[in-house]
């Protein structure tokens, strides 16, 4: 396995929101605002991070689609927390801020045996290694 990137969870706010004036947002600040949650069942990273600090967010909506959340935040229906890879290219009409005390996730690629891997698989891994950092920056 090779870790390619650490993806950061970020606060997603409408431009006119009171928290937009801050450079970073704490979990405590997030918990006090109407929140739009990506419904990931029991595996929600943001919910685990909040629970670890004994915080309970004001969940207004549970949504199954990342891009629906972005549209809802743009319309001022609440705030959310999403990973940077999801937000890449969709920042217009939103204010994005780092969240203090929030875990990152590893984006990785795994394989069993390089020596027995097909040439196409090896080329794919090489392509990902070379191009993922460029895609993330753009």
PLM features per residue range, with description:
Residues 1-9, 13-35:
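Flexible hinge/capping segments at coil-to-helix
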């Amino acid at each position: 396995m090779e870790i390619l990137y650490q993806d950061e969870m970020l606060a997603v706010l409408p431009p006119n929101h009171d928290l937009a004036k801050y450079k970073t947002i704490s979990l405590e600040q997030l918990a006090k605002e109407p929140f739009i949650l990506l419904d990931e069942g029991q595996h929600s990273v943001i919910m685990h991070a909040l629970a670890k600090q004994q915080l309970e967010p004001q969940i207004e909506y549970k949504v199954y689609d990342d891009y629906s959340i972005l549209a809802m935040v743009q319309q001022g229906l609440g705030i959310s927390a999403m990973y940077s890879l999801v937000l890449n290219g969709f920042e217009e009409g939103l204010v994005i801020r780092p969240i203090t005390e929030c875990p990152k996730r590893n984006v990785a690629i795994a394989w069993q045996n390089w020596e027995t891997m097909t040439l196409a698989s090896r080329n794919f891994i090489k392509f990902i290694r070379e191009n993922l950092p460029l895609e993330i920056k753009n």
